[in-house]
Amino acid sequence: MEAVERIENPYGIRLRIFLQPKASRDQIVGLHDSELKIAITAPPVDGAANAHLLKYLSKLFKVPKSSIVLEKGELQRHKQLFVPEPKLIPKEIEALL
């Protein structure tokens, strides 16, 4: 499975992510094995990293954070998310489609 996959029905983007919490800044780092590595500033405590990741992705894709679905990996660094009907696709992610 690819790190970034375009889904047709329902339309959206599925992301396989390797999350790096407690980074110095929020950013898409690049590919890490077969996953998209994303660094965020939030610590991995009490769901703070997941909440921060959803907020960061909602800003990148211009969608409500409540619409992003965390499909796998709630308590792990390896995650799978679905972003339905993104209004904008960041250039780092567009390059992987």
From Swiss-Prot:
InterPro entries: DUF167, YggU-like_sf. GO terms for cellular component: cytoplasm. Transmembrane segments: none annotated. It holds the Pfam family DUF167. It comes from the Bacteria. Belongs to the UPF0235 family. PANTHER family: UPF0235 PROTEIN C15ORF40. NCBIfam families: DUF167 family protein (TIGR00251), PRK05090.1 (NF003466). This is UPF0235 protein APP7_1431. It comes from Actinobacillus pleuropneumoniae serotype 7 (strain AP76).
